[in-house]
Structure formats: C-alpha cells, structure tokens
Amino acid sequence: MSPCAVVVGPPGAGKTTVGRLLAERLGVAFRDTDDDVVRVAGKPIAEIFTGDGEPVFRAMEERAVAAALAEHDGVLSLGGGSVLSERTRALLAEQPVVFLSVGLAEGARRTGLSTARPLLAGVNPRATFKALLDARLPLYREVATWELATDGVEPDALVDRIVERVTADRAAGRE
C-alpha cells in the first residue's frame, strides 16, 4: 500500500488545502502527518517545539511519515520540514510526490506572524521564510515527481493539474 499522491512544500504553499481537495476529487482519504504528530504527542506542534525542542519534533515527524507511507493509500500531506530527514527523502523516492512551490513574497504573506508555525515566529518572518526556502528548495526538488507553482493559482486549478498527472501516470501503470 502506498499513497496515490504525496504533497510537499514549504509552510503556506497550500499542502493541506490542495491535499484535501485532491483527495475529494479522487474519491480517496486524506491524511496529514502534522495531524498524526499532534495526535500522538497530545499537544500542538508549537508546544512540541517550545517544550521538547525541534529534534524531538523532527523524530516524531519522521516516524509519522514512515507510518503513513506504509499504511495510507489516499492523498498524504507532509509537514514542510519533513524533507529535512534523509530517511524520509529515501522513502519518498518511489512515491508520486507533488511539490507545491511558493514564492518568497506570497509565502511570507500567507504565513505571516503565525505562532502556529514555530519556525517562522521570529522578529523578521520574511527573512526567516527566505532562509527556510533557500535551505529546503533543493530537498523538495530532490523528492518531487511534479512541481507546481502556487502563486496566483487557485487551489481548484492546482488540483485539476495534479489530477491530470496522477490519472495519466495510473493509465501508464506508474502508480
């Protein structure tokens, strides 16, 4: 069993929104590994970061991704930092991965000063977001089967493009 699509990207790219719409359109279940981590930890991600530290969160995230890839056959959305794990990137190598990219200005606008996004809650969220994009962009591209820019594109239009690609790959026997 493996997901029909795995959605990755930085914070604010629309992973959860697009993932839910995609699952609905394909008639499959949706799963978000951030939700899995919160359920297992019994507390929000921001509290895990502040109380336990980022390394503890990343270990929990890595386990959640591995479990979801093994158990879930619908659409799977991963946390923005999940690609930092070498193990996770290796597991994604054989998966249909959709990388939702977002530009600096749009990403900073979408994420703002959200305290729910602990890595972006600093003094200068735009500079923090740029550093995050610079560090992660090569990793997102490493795991991506497809890359779709989200700036100025409605979620439904993104889903249309993903459905076309997933359907074409299924027809060609590349699931």
UniProtKB/Swiss-Prot annotation:
UniProt cross-references to Pfam families, sorted A to Z: SKI
InterPro entries reported in the protein's UniProt record: P-loop_NTPase, Shikimate/glucono_kinase, Shikimate_kinase/TSH1, Shikimate_kinase_CS
Binding sites annotated in the UniProt record for ATP: 12-17, 117
Record keywords, A-Z: Amino-acid biosynthesis, Aromatic amino acid biosynthesis, ATP-binding, Cytoplasm, Kinase, Magnesium, Metal-binding, Nucleotide-binding, Transferase
SUPFAM superfamilies attached to this UniProt entry: P-loop containing nucleoside triphosphate hydrolases
EC number, as in UniProt: 2.7.1.71
EC top class, as a word: transferase
Gene3D superfamilies: P-loop containing nucleotide triphosphate hydrolases
Catalytic activity: shikimate + ATP = 3-phosphoshikimate + ADP + H(+)
Positions bound to Mg(2+): 16
Cofactor(s) of this protein: Mg(2+)
Cellular localization per UniProt: Cytoplasm
Entry keyword annotation includes Amino-acid biosynthesis: yes
Residues the entry annotates as binding substrate: 34, 58, 80, 136
GO cellular component, as recorded: cytosol
Gene Ontology molecular function terms on file: ATP binding; magnesium ion binding; shikimate kinase activity
Note on how the cofactor is bound: Binds 1 Mg(2+) ion per subunit.
Pathway(s) where this gene product acts: Metabolic intermediate biosynthesis; chorismate biosynthesis; chorismate from D-erythrose 4-phosphate and phosphoenolpyruvate: step 5/7
Record's keyword annotation contains Acetylation: no
CDD domains reported in the protein's UniProt record: SK (cd00464)
Cross-referenced HAMAP family: Shikimate_kinase
Function: Catalyzes the specific phosphorylation of the 3-hydroxyl group of shikimic acid using ATP as a cosubstrate.
Subunit note: Monomer.
Protein name, UniProt field: Shikimate kinase
Species in which this protein is naturally found: Saccharopolyspora erythraea (strain ATCC 11635 / DSM 40517 / JCM 4748 / NBRC 13426 / NCIMB 8594 / NRRL 2338)
